[in-house]
């Protein structure tokens, strides 16, 4: 039985208030990213080569992008169960991305982009839009899932119309940023 059927048939189903959780997670994630962006990087870390972390970030972002596309296709075909599974997979790879992203920025200094001219303009446009939308996607994605869990289907659809394209853009541009800056690591 799907959650939707369960909620419709069960009068004891109660909506939960996920707003405090969403606010706290958004503040913690975005706060960590901002804090670590200004740090010089941990010195004397020799357990492994931290240069592998940006590649891992790109791999996790690639999987997130593919999972989101699959989730979008599934929901367009009205296959809610498959859609839900791909969304959960996207959350898992996004979480893994965040872990490796935070680790990378804690363990190493920022790498400046070495390109110039039009490529530098393109790089910085992609990077800036990626950063801004990455901060916005955290509460959007969490709110979308919370509304789905609470069976607020119409509200879920409304916010998902914003969440899905932004999350797709963020995951794709994360890979593009890596491809463009990787020669300078």
Curated annotation (Swiss-Prot):
Top-level lineage group: Bacteria
InterPro entries listed in its UniProt record: DUF420 (IPR007352)
Protein name: Uncharacterized protein BpOF4_00895
């Amino acid at each position: 039985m799907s959650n939707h059927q369960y909620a419709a048939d069960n009068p004891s189903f109660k909506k939960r208030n996920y707003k405090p959780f969403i606010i706290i997670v958004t503040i913690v994630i975005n706060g960590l990213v901002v804090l670590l962006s200004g740090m010089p990087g941990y010195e004397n870390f020799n357990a492994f080569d931290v240069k592998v972390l940006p590649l891992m970030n790109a791999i996790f972002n690639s999987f997130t992008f593919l999972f989101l596309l699959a989730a979008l296709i599934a929901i367009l075909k009205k296959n809610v169960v498959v859609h839900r599974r791909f969304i959960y997979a996207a959350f898992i790879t996004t979480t893994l991305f965040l872990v490796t992203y935070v680790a990378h920025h804690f363990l190493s200094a920022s790498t400046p982009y070495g390109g110039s001219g039009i490529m530098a303009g393109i790089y910085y446009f992609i990077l800036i839009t990626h950063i801004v939308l990455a901060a916005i996607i955290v509460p959007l994605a969490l709110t979308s899932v919370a509304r789905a869990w609470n069976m607020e289907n119409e509200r879920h659809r409304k916010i998902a119309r914003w969440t899905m394209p932004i999350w797709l853009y963020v995951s794709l541009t994360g890979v593009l940023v890596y491809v463009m800056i990787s020669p300078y690591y």
